[in-house]
């Protein structure tokens, strides 16, 4: 699927409903994004279908990737699996989920050599991590099984 305003709203709503109001608001008090057309309906993202505020949307300045450095670091990891020039068109959602599980299981110096998943569990608890993993079809990859190379998605 292509990212449209509707698919982004649907994804946020799925997370909101799966996490519940309190956990969603704890995890996503603010969403910082770019000015892409998929984020062109901020009120539909900020407010739940029942009208309750669930987050606040803020936009980065154009050409200011430094405003979201951790996202840019994830893009670098994605490019180790899918080098520049590689089409994303043939990727299934399962491929993307697998790749992101490997990316988010990888320890990083900026996180004290912990992975994003480990830091999440430290900050919010394993129970909430497990809930989020189920909702996003993710899983923690053991460190000795992480593959951040094109071979990860070769069939």
State the predicted function of each range.
Residues 1-22:
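Active-site beta-loop-alpha junctions of metal-dependent nucleic acid enzymes
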Residues 2-5, 64, 85:
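Short strand->helix junction
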Residues 4, 24, 30-31, 35, ...:
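Conserved, well-structured core segments that form or line functional sites
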Residues 14-17, 77-84, 101-105:
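Short basic/hydrophobic patches in alpha-helices and adjacent helix-turn junctions
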Residues 22-27, 52-54:
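Short helix-terminating capping/connector loops at secondary-structure junctions
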Residues 33-35, 42-48, 57-81, 89-101:
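RNase H-like two-metal-ion nuclease catalytic core shared by retroviral integrases
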Residues 48-50, 121:
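Glycine-rich, phosphate-binding/catalytic loops in enzymes
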Residues 84-155:
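C-terminal domain-tail junction helix/linker
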């Amino acid at each position: 699927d292509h990212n449209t305003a509707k698919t982004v709203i649907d994804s946020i709503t799925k997370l909101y409903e799966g996490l519940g109001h309190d956990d969603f608001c704890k995890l996503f008090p603010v969403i910082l994004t770019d000015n892409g057309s998929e984020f062109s309906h901020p009120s539909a993202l900020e407010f739940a279908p029942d009208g309750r505020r669930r987050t606040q949307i803020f936009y980065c300045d154009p050409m200011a990737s430094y405003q979201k450095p951790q996202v840019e670091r994830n893009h670098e990891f994605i490019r180790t699996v899918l080098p520049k020039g590689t089409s994303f068109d043939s990727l299934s959602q399962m491929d993307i989920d697998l790749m992101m599980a490997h990316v988010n299981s990888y320890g990083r110096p900026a996180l004290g050599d912990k992975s994003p998943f480990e830091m999440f569990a430290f900050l919010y608890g394993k129970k909430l991590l497990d809930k989020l993993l189920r909702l996003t079809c993710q899983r923690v990859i053991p460190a000795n099984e992480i593959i951040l190379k094109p071979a990860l998605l070769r069939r």
